[in-house]
Swiss-Prot record:
Keyword Aminoacyl-tRNA synthetase found: no
Residues binding Mg(2+) 1, per UniProt: E424, D498
Cofactor note: Binds two Mg(2+) per subunit. The magnesium ions form salt bridges with both the protein and the DNA. Can also accept other divalent metal cations, such as Mn(2+) or Ca(2+).
E.C. number: 5.6.2.2
Keyword line: ATP-binding, Cytoplasm, DNA-binding, Isomerase, Magnesium, Metal-binding, Nucleotide-binding, Topoisomerase
Protein name: DNA gyrase subunit B
Catalytic reaction annotation: ATP-dependent breakage, passage and rejoining of double-stranded DNA
First-level EC class: isomerase
Subcellular location: Cytoplasm
SUBUNIT field: Heterotetramer, composed of two GyrA and two GyrB chains. In the heterotetramer, GyrA contains the active site tyrosine that forms a transient covalent intermediate with DNA, while GyrB binds cofactors and catalyzes ATP hydrolysis.
Length: 804
């Protein structure tokens, strides 16, 4: 076969064609949502550049119903005059020419952001449609683009007193796949971040689809950012260290505070763009921090008195810091700007941090004492951990040559083809060992709940047998000097626990361990959660496995509706087999059951059920109407209730809203309880949903409709009772087994349902928002009780998967 390679093979992609051909080079991943959201941030960064130049105070980001998004600012507005070189408007040049903009002449913007330095032209190229509005010179200019090409010239469509730019774009869903919807959490995180970094700039985010909005406006700047990041932590000093200064044309702004935790959280920004991999600003900060703290400790006699040596890790334990620099023409290691390599930044950071930190330590003796105490304790613990590690090595516990005895290893030696199951308990571990494929599946049983590493110090973690066994089995070591993810022995680590509360707890403890000490395993996509079935269903000698409670409920519903019809005694035409109407009503009823559970503290269940069979309560201004409504309600309630309870109807006058509100009193022996239908409940989402289903049921009752299956009829009048009876009768000859533990399955079942690559289901653990994840682990797994209590109080009623 002849293979020629000549000049004809060299393709020149002109204009924005290169962007469309290789979008990932310019905007990031187009499948996982990264690139989609970077489109928004590219436009927002232009508005922030206007703010940095002193011309913009307000930015509005709106997610529209049609999945388009708009960004509007009150800056100067994109220039509209004709560009000398291109012969078209400057606005059109910016929208259609790569690397065209005001940031390249060093006069319009002294410093600027922009994640990839390609700006809004790339956003235009990757949009199905884009609308440009410019408010400038008391005129409104408008232009529309389709797939990156202008459909009209920039024209005046009106007049205005405001200035600024508005860009609305519709992403091209042929380019952006998988994740195609804008995510509130991702957008709000970045916009909140920008509001802290640029104090006194208001950034308003509005989601028209979900009807939620938030205004990000921070006057406190980086100090307020530190307070936000340390919200669920316990700071050891109240005064936040902060300075803003300039050296060698590098503007440096730093804020930091130590807390009682053990994690180091340092966030680096250059011209508002985050650097996940740090760079010269981070290395300059770290070296200055270590040197300054050592100088202070030596000068004050702490080192001699305590006979210690302080290293960088000691000074950064429990430290939350923000490093924000602004520099003209920064240099990065790659197009994505994840690491700063500008050499002049390091010396500027070292000099300024040394100067201002030493001043802070000398002027705040009590704060300094708390910080020094923390650093000395960290040094002692580090040395104790080193001695403990050396001791365990001598005993062979952490010797990576010898694997733990509990591990049943696989034959495969290629990590990419190997997987390890972390199994809850020896019993399930035994079944898993028999079920596995020995060629590439290893089994490590874990006894009981492992240590909560969020609360424990490093040396305590190393003393935990289950943790050290796990570390040894994985083979990648632990700790800053010994941890090497390249030595990981398995590229699939599968957590397999029981489907009960204890199993969830063990799974959470393991996730905490991996997130805090081996985050690269998560970032590389090596961590999974097995999905063993919760139910085994046997029907007509056929067995099927059902993964969870929701799937089981759907299975019960579909089984109950087999050969089921709706009939009417008065209207013979109403006869629908496996009908959509009944499915829809039952689905609504399931939602109502969830609502009943959430508001059961406000009303007893029998009152909530009775609401389904009464007309909507409205016209609260009419006392006679309200009185009749509540009296009819109580009469029906009393008929269906036991004789031990006495119900009475009352109304109360709400003087504030000038309305009448019905009230039910329930008396049992000497105890009397009151339940009021107040205006807040009547206007609530919950009551509207109850009424919506109730209206449908009442219409069916009026038409004498009933449910019929296998010559049995079920009345609509007591829907809850008869629906449950329908399901009960449908499952008379069906055997349902609920697995509480993995040990209840024999090896064959475990292989078939959970371990066979051909049939198993697994959840892959991914990491998107580091700040949110940090806070979640700190809140739920940390040693502060109050934030956890507030979290539970806030979200308890939203919980649906509760194991009772």
């Amino acid at each position: 076969m002849k293979n020629t390679y000549t000049s004809s093979n060299i393709k020149i992609l002109k204009g924005l064609d290169a962007v469309k051909k290789r979008p990932g080079m310019y905007i990031g991943n187009t499948d996982d949502g990264t690139g989609l959201h970077h489109m928004v941030f590219e436009v927002v960064d232009n508005s922030i550049d206007e703010a940095l130049a002193g011309f913009c105070k307000n930015i509005i980001v709106t997610i529209h119903d049609d999945n388009s998004i708009s960004i509007q600012d009150d800056g100067r507005g994109i220039p509209t005059d004709i560009h000398d070189e291109e012969g078209i408007s400057a606005a059109e040049v910016i929208m259609t020419v790569l690397h065209a903009g005001g940031k390249f002449d060093n006069t319009s913007y002294k410093v600027s952001g922009g994640l990839h330095g390609v700006g809004v032209s790339v956003v235009n190229a990757l949009s199905k449609k884009l609308e440009l509005f410019i408010y400038r010179d008391k005129k409104i200019y408008y232009q529309i683009y389709k797939n990156g090409y202008p459909k009209n010239t920039l024209s005046i469509i009106g007049y205005t007193k405001i200035t600024g730019t508005k860009i609305r774009f519709w992403p091209n869903l042929e380019i952006f796949t998988n994740v195609t919807q804008f995510n509130w959490e991702i957008l709000s995180k970045r916009l909140r971040e920008l509001s802290f970094l640029n104090s006194n700039v208001s950034i308003y985010l509005d989601d028209a689809k979900k009807h939620i909005n938030e205004n990000f406006y921070q006057q406190g700047g980086l100090k307020e950012f530190i307070i936000y990041l340390n919200k669920n932590k316990k700071p050891i000093h109240s005064k936040i260290f902060y300075f803003s200064s300039k050296k060698n044309n590098v503007e440096v702004e730093i804020a930091m505070q130590w807390n009682k935790g053990f994690q180091e959280n340092i966030y680096c920004y250059t011209n508002n763009i985050p650097q996940q991999d740090g760079g010269t600003h981070l290395s300059g900060f770290r070296s200055a921090l270590t040197r300054t703290m050592n100088n202070y400790l030596d000068k004050e006699g702490y080192i001699k008195k305590n006979k210690i040596n302080i290293i960088g890790d000691d000074t950064r334990e429990g430290l939350t810091a923000i490093i924000s620099i602004k520099i003209n023409d920064p240099k990065f290691s790659s197009q994505t700007k994840n690491k700063l390599v500008s050499s002049e930044v390091k010396s500027a950071l070292e000099s300024l941090v040394n100067e201002f930190l030493m001043e802070f330590l000398l002027e705040n003796p009590q704060e300094s004492k708390n910080i020094v105490t923390k650093i000395i304790e960290s040094s002692r613990v580090r040395n104790a951990a080193r001695r403990a590690r050396e001791m365990t090595r001598k005993k062979g516990t952490l010797d990576l040559i010898g694997l733990p005895g509990k591990l049943s290893d696989c034959q495969e030696r290629d990590p990419a083809l190997s997987e390890i199951y972390l199994v809850e308990g020896d019993s399930a571990g035994g079944s898993a060992k028999q079920a596995r494929n020995r060629k590439n599946q290893a089994i490590l049983p874990l006894k009981g709940k492992i240590l909560n590493v969020e609360k424990a110090r490093y040396e305590k973690m190393l003393s935990s047998q289950e943790v050290t066994t796990l570390i040894t089995a994985l083979g990648c070591g632990i700790g800053k000097n010994e941890y090497n993810p390249e030595k990981l022995r398995y590229h699939r680590i599968i957590i397999m626990t029981d489907a009960d509360v204890d199993g969830s707890h063990i799974r959470t403890l393991l996730l905490t361990f991996f997130y805090r000490y081996m985050p690269e395993i998560i970032q590389r996509g090596y961590l999974y959660i097995a999905q063993p079935p919760l139910y085994k269903v046997t029907k007509n000698n056929k067995t099927r496995y059902i993964k969870d409670k929701n799937t089981m409920e759907n299975y019960k519903l579909s089984t109950a509706l087999e050969n089921t019809i709706l009939e009417s005694n008065t209207d013979k035409e109403i006869k629908i087999k496996c009908n959509y109407t009944l499915k829809k009503i039952i689905s609504e009823y399931k939602i109502i059951q969830t609502i009943f559970f959430k508001i059961k503290d406000n009303f007893p269940l029998n009152i909530l059920n009775e609401m389904l069979y009464h007309p909507k309560l409205n016209n609260l201004n009419d006392e006679v109407y309200v009185n009749n409504w509540i009296n009819n309600f109580v009469i029906q309630l009393q008929k269906k209730s036991s004789s031990t309870r006495n119900y009475s109807a009352h109304i109360t006058f709400n003087s504030k809203d000038k309305i009448f509100e019905p009230l039910i009193k329930i008396q049992k022996n000497a105890e009397v309880k009151e339940y009021k239908f107040d205006i807040t409940f009547i206007n609530s989402y919950e009551y509207q949903k109850i009424y919506s289903l109730g209206k449908k049921l009442q219409e069916m009752i009026q038409k004498n409709i009933h449910i019929k299956k296998n010559n049995k009829t079920y009345s609509i009048k007591n829907f809850q009772k008869n629906f449950e009876l329908l399901i009960q009768n449908s499952f008379k000859n069906v055997l349902i087994q609920r697995y509480k533990g993995l040990g209840e399955m024999n090896p064959e079942q475990l292989w078939k349902t959970t371990m066979n690559p051909e049939t198993r289901r697994m959840l892959k653990i991914t990491l998107h928002n580091i700040d949110t994840t940090n806070k979640l682990f700190n809140t739920l797994m940390g040693d502060s009780v109050e934030p956890r209590k507030l979290f539970i109080e806030l979200y308890a009623l939203k919980a649906s998967n509760i194991d009772i």
